[in-house]
């Protein structure tokens, strides 16, 4: 992504950010580009069919692993977000016209790719009366209809915390309901000005009350302090979060927030152990972990921890490996 955003002038914050050059990554942040047979087949299919996934278009470092396990992530609602977070690669601007056919097309892509587990995320659509709640819910329903053996994880904005809008999504019964808090209270407003920390916790609490497996994510290296991470983990658990992923911030472009620090692998191991001790049912932590990484395995693990039966058509997810991005001691 270039420093200059498409279709608008840079904000003063972005101009200030751009004064700091892109940071050089430390030696421990490395990816493994192992192209197995499932990855090769999926890559060929996506290319020939003209399909679109976040995995490919965002250059995710874990694409080789996830595609080998037939897991992929899709972005809905357009390419322009009505909100701006200082770490996020998605551009802010006026969204395109609402596309009611998008859920069907995404579900067709999931079916054609033969996915075992799909993650669906999207942009905030504050321009719409329902903030896009129907779009998220209908995408879940369409994937379940076209691919009954595929798990669906939905990663949503906050829908302003409105119980009615959230209820639309809950009613579609995704395997996992995810809403990412991303950072700690002290720097939350600066980094995510259109969101509110307590409101995000309440969104997760509402998902838990609806009987769904819940999930969130923390990004490290944006200016937080160590004890603040511990408090955020406790806050998330108290709100009813079942699954937590913890990752390193990687700056998308010069106009985004500069990296405050590089978190060493041993700190990720420490945080993983801490999160497990707090009581999270599923934890993945590492520099290259992303919120959708090994998502199917984490869901199956959480289901078993709750004493729930994993449907027969999804039991294969429980046997997936932890993956290379998980930090190890």
UniProtKB/Swiss-Prot annotation:
Record note on cofactor: Binds 2 [4Fe-4S] clusters per subunit. One cluster is coordinated with 3 cysteines and an exchangeable S-adenosyl-L-methionine.
Top-level EC class as recorded in UniProt: transferase
Chain residues that bind [4Fe-4S] cluster 2: 81, 85, 88
Gene3D superfamilies: Aldolase class I
PROSITE patterns: RADICAL_SAM
Keywords associated with the record: 4Fe-4S, Cytoplasm, Iron, Iron-sulfur, Metal-binding, S-adenosyl-L-methionine, Transferase
UniProt domain Radical SAM core: residue ranges: 67-281
Biological pathway: Protein modification; protein lipoylation via endogenous pathway; protein N(6)-(lipoyl)lysine from octanoyl-[acyl-carrier-protein]: step 2/2
Binding site for [4Fe-4S] cluster 1: 55, 60, 66, 292
Annotated compartments: Cytoplasm
Keyword Kinase: no
Entry's Gene Ontology cellular component terms: cytoplasm
MF terms (GO), sorted A to Z: 4 iron, 4 sulfur cluster binding; lipoate synthase activity; metal ion binding
EC number: 2.8.1.8
Keyword Cytoplasm carried by entry: yes
The protein's required cofactors: [4Fe-4S] cluster
Catalytic activity: [[Fe-S] cluster scaffold protein carrying a second [4Fe-4S](2+) cluster] + N(6)-octanoyl-L-lysyl-[protein] + 2 oxidized [2Fe-2S]-[ferredoxin] + 2 S-adenosyl-L-methionine + 4 H(+) = [[Fe-S] cluster scaffold protein] + N(6)-[(R)-dihydrolipoyl]-L-lysyl-[protein] + 4 Fe(3+) + 2 hydrogen sulfide + 2 5'-deoxyadenosine + 2 L-methionine + 2 reduced [2Fe-2S]-[ferredoxin]
NCBIfam families assigned: lipA, PRK05481.1, PRK12928.1
Family the UniProt entry places it in: Belongs to the radical SAM superfamily. Lipoyl synthase family.
Protein name, per record: Lipoyl synthase
